[in-house]
A protein has these predicted regions:
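HotDog/MaoC-like acyl-thioester-processing domains
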Residues: 84-85, 96-153
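Hydrophobic beta-strand-centered segment that forms part of the acyl-chain substrate-binding groove
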Residues: 55-90
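Short beta-strand micro-motifs enriched in acidic
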Residues: 18-20, 94-98
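A conserved, well-ordered hydrophobic junction motif at loop->secondary-structure transitions
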Residues: 26-53, 66
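A short, polar/proline- and glycine-enriched secondary-structure boundary/capping micro-motif
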Residues: 37-41, 70, 115, 129-131
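Short coil/loop residues immediately preceding or within conserved phosphate-binding loops
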Residues: 12, 72-74, 102-104
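Non-catalytic linker/capping segments at the edges of enzyme domains
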Residues: 1-34, 140, 145-153
Length: 153
């Protein structure tokens, strides 16, 4: 079960993602108290995991095609301010470069007031989903749409 999007993962973020008209992806999500490192702060690894997830989902949002996949080659995260848990945060991912073999994305985590808390640049190698998921139960690992009433972020 995915630690970021897995709806059945009780210890994960269970983060929803929204494809935007400009080809970016957005998320309204909240870290939980069991995601802390120091009191009042989210663990840096979980911040990086969200930065990574938004990059791949930005590819899907740009092309409106969830059959496109890749695996992370490099991840450069910058921690700007402490990221709190138990509060709604805003995530955004945007594709910045694409080739036949790879793609790159910039991802951002903001508080509700628009203050940048963390951001990152991710490079991915394109890889077919059947190679990535070989031998796995893919229910939580593959995207599927869930209807909701969100109309604006």
């Amino acid at each position: 079960m995915c630690a970021i999007c897995g709806l059945d993962n009780l210890y994960g973020l269970q983060a929803p993602f929204y494809n935007m008209a400009d080809g970016s992806v957005m998320s309204l999500f909240s870290y939980k108290d069991h995601h802390q490192s120091y009191p009042g702060r989210v663990h840096g690894g979980l911040i990086s995991a969200m930065i990574d997830e938004m990059g791949l989902r930005a590819l899907w949002a740009k092309h409106l095609d969830e059959s496109l996949f890749g695996v992370t080659m490099t991840l450069d995260t910058k921690y700007r301010k402490p990221v709190p848990y138990s509060t709604i945060l805003v995530g955004k991912g945007v594709i910045t470069a694409e080739t036949a073999r790879s793609f790159e994305a910039d991802s951002f985590i903001y508080d509700r007031e628009g203050t940048l808390l963390a951001n990152g640049h991710v490079k991915y190698m394109r890889l077919a989903p059947e190679i990535i998921t070989a031998g796995s139960d893919v229910h939580e690992e593959m995207p599927y749409l869930i209807a909701d009433d969100v109309t604006e972020i």
